[in-house]
């Protein structure tokens, strides 16, 4: 869409709001998500008038925050705009999730004018006590940098917050009073400066020496996780894997970080819930490199990992360790490059990875056979093609797909640490806006979708054509598996899912209800052929059936 200059922005004066937008554009932001409110309306005029940034409105602030998160995971930076008080508190859950999962999101809050705040009167959207920094203080717990912009220092403060967001890969908060947004200023004089390299030559040298001694002539095994992606060290990791025959795996959090079609890819490591071949290879490795790994309860089989520190090289954001000896400051990319150099320089080749025993292909289900979890995820996975962006909500969708190998070039997004159900539907909007050339595939349960379903209309308005699989298992199946199998609090109202897109303003779509394998197969075949429109497939599953991996996790679960 081509931005149209608004009447409110016909004044040629360059403002603080323009400065903020130009810095965001410099960092790769071409869309901003949010919800209008009277304290941010004039700033929104500047967004609409900006030559390279486009406004994408959401149905509510929570969904806008989720959309910004999905966008930020693919673009490396994103922004969401809300109004003071009521708007910013509504997006807090999404911002906290971005903080937990290392997603760079800039939260811009339109606030009352400085003069109005100075009166300490009971303004709308405030708590009525004359204190207008309550919510700024709340934001300090879930953002890496905050600023309450003042005219004289606005540019410097914007640069500080954006630099921290870029460096730490976590959200930042900017309180932009409506009069400060309009205040005249000068455009940026130079690109946003980058922090100097954070690697000490001495730390790198000592790390390399210790790694050489530990590795010796052993074959290296690698376990990688999402921080490699967030810290933009994927190329360095791939170079390490190409330096020798290196068996490797990821956690569920880092699924699709590496090419899962590679013969050296072992699978997903989840502690005691892992497939035995994967568990044995990771836990029995002579030397294991853990790159960007964060063990959380839901991706480690409730902390059942058995990793021997004496045989482990751990690569973190700013420090690394060899057999528990810490070396810092040492950036992840530098440590990975050092390991690749060690492997290429030692002049030996490790043996090939032994492939798993060949298993006969599963029998094709009969077309009239009722759907099961295994059938659904097998068929969904077979429908994926390179370039797809797959978002799986935290439930049977996430754990059903975690067990399946993805085609090369597929990006997988979940939220296993924060685990806010409903997240993926608006996040899919953000992902699709970030890369409209890549088809988005959304996998979500009925209970989760009921929380954020309004954004179906946003897909349509933005001209996006996702494939949406809604798992209708009649309520909160994961919760039923954990506790309260027949409890009324795990029940939800049954919706007519195939009629919902029309009710929410979707004008170009197809909708199917699949109860049998044949119906699912037909629906996904049509979805693959019709890339010009949204395709929603409701799949009906038994209310108590869960995927294998989720069953193992639930079985090992203790009260947390």
Swiss-Prot record:
**What InterPro entries has UniProt attached to this entry?**
DHS-like_NAD/FAD-binding_dom, PDC/IPDC-like, THDP-binding, Thiamin_PyroP_enz_cen_dom, Thiamin_PyroP_enz_TPP-bd_dom, TPP-bd_CS, TPP_enzyme_TPP-bd, TPP_PDC_IPDC
- Does the record carry Metal-binding as a key word? yes
Q: Which CDD domains match?
A: TPP_PDC_IPDC, TPP_PYR_PDC_IPDC_like
Return the GO cellular component terms, semicolon-separated. cytosol
Task: Tell me which family the UniProt entry assigns to this protein.
Answer: Belongs to the TPP enzyme family.
At which positions is Mg(2+) bound? 446, 473, 475
Query: What GO molecular function terms would the record report?
Result: magnesium ion binding; pyruvate decarboxylase activity; thiamine pyrophosphate binding
Q: Which Pfam families match?
A: TPP_enzyme_C, TPP_enzyme_M, TPP_enzyme_N
Indicate which residues the UniProt annotation says bind thiamine diphosphate: 61
Cofactor annotation comment: Binds 1 metal ion per subunit.
Gene3D superfamilies with a match to the protein in the record: 3.40.50.970, TPP-binding domain
Q: What name appears for this protein in its UniProt entry?
A: Alpha-keto-acid decarboxylase
Q: Where is this region: Thiamine pyrophosphate binding?
A: 396-478
| Needed co-factor(s) | a metal cation; thiamine diphosphate
């Amino acid at each position: 869409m081509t931005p149209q200059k608004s009447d409110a922005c016909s004044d040629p004066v360059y403002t603080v709001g323009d400065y903020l937008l130009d810095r965001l554009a410099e960092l790769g932001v071409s869309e901003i998500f949010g919800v209008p409110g009277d304290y941010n309306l004039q700033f929104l005029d500047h967004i609409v008038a900006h030559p390279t940034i486009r406004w994408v409105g959401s149905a509510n602030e929570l969904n806008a925050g989720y959309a910004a998160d999905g966008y930020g995971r693919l673009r490396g930076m994103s922004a969401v705009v809300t109004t003071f008080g009521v708007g910013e508190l509504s997006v807090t859950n999404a911002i906290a999730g971005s903080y937990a999962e290392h997603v760079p999101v800039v939260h811009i809050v339109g606030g009352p004018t400085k003069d109005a705040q100075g009166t300490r009167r009971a303004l709308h959207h405030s708590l009525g006590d004359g204190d207008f920094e309550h919510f700024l203080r709340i934001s300090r717990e879930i953002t890496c940098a905050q600023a309450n912009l003042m005219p004289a220092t606005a540019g410097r403060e914007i640069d500080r917050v954006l630099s921290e967001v870029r460096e730490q890969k976590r959200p930042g908060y900017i309180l932009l009073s409506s009069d400060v947004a309009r205040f005249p200023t000068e455009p940026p004089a130079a690109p946003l400066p980058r922090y100097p390299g954070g690697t000490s030559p001495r730390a790198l040298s000592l790390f390399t020496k210790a790694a050489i001694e530990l590795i010796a002539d052993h074959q290296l095994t690698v376990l990688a996780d999402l921080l490699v992606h967030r810290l933009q060290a994927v190329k360095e990791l791939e170079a390490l894997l190409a330096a020798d025959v290196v068996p490797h795996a990821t956690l569920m959090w880092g699924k699709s970080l590496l090419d899962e079609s590679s013969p050296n890819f072992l699978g997903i490591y989840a502690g005691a819930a892992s497939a035995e071949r994967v568990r044995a290879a990771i836990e029995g490795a002579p030397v294991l490199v853990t790159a960007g790994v964060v063990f959380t309860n839901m991706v480690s089989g409730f902390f059942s990992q058995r990793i021997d520190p004496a045989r482990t090289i751990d690569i973190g954001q700013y420090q690394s360790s060899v057999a528990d000896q810490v070396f810092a400051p040492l950036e992840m990319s530098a440590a990975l490059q050092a390991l690749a150099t060690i492997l290429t320089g030692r002049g030996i080749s490790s043996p090939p990875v032994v492939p798993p025993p060949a298993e006969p292909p599963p029998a094709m289900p009969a077309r009239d056979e009722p759907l099961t979890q295994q059938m659904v995820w097998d068929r969904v996975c077979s429908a994926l093609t390179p370039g797809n962006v797959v978002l799986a909500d935290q439930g049977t969708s996430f754990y059903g797909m975690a067990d399946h190998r993805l085609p090369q070039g597929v990006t997988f997004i979940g939220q296993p640490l924060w685990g806010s159900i409903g997240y993926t539907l608006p996040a899919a909007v953000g992902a699709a806006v970030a890369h409209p050339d890549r088809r988005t595939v959304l996998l979500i349960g009925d209970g989760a979708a009921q929380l954020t379903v309004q954004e179906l209309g946003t897909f349509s308005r933005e001209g996006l054509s996702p494939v949406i699989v809604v798992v209708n298992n009649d309520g909160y199946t994961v919760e039923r598996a954990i506790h309260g199998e027949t409890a009324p609090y795990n029940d939800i109202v049954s919706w007519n899912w195939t009629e919902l897109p029309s009710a929410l303003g979707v004008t170009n779509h197809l909708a199917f209800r699949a109860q049998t394998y044949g119906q699912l197969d037909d629906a996904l075949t049509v979805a693959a052929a019709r890339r010009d429109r949204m395709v929603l497939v409701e799949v009906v599953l038994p209310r108590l059936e869960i995927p294998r991996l989720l069953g193992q996790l639930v079985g090992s679960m203790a009260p947390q």
